[in-house]
Amino acid sequence: MANLILKQSLIILLIIYSTPILSSQARILRTYRPTTMGDMDSQVLLRELGIDLSKFKGQDERRFLVDSERVSPGGPDPQHH
């Protein structure tokens, strides 16, 4: 009988303490950032990611984003079973 009362008490306390958490709402933060990625300028995004664009001046500005030595895979090896 004592175990049943203890279990019921714990369940009631759990419900009471979890109610504020379940009913809480998210707060909207006002920021200067655009809401969608389509509106964001790539230079702004790179600056926010911590990439210093001044290091890449004098070179092709997009070259550091794409590796020109990359080789596309040729598919499955015909010798492999």
From Swiss-Prot:
Question: Gene Ontology terms, cellular component aspect?
Answer: apoplast
Q: In the UniProt record, which residues carry a glycan? A: 76
Domain of life of the native organism: Eukaryota
Provide the GO biological process annotations.
cell-cell signaling involved in cell fate commitment; regulation of lateral root development; regulation of root morphogenesis
Q: Where is the signal peptide?
A: 1-26
Protein keywords: Developmental protein, Differentiation, Glycoprotein, Hydroxylation, Secreted, Signal
Name of protein:
CLAVATA3/ESR (CLE)-related protein 6
Residue positions, PTM Hydroxyproline = 73, 76
Organism source for this protein? Arabidopsis thaliana (Mouse-ear cress)
Give the similarity note: Belongs to the CLV3/ESR signal peptide family.
Presence of the UniProt keyword Membrane in the record: no
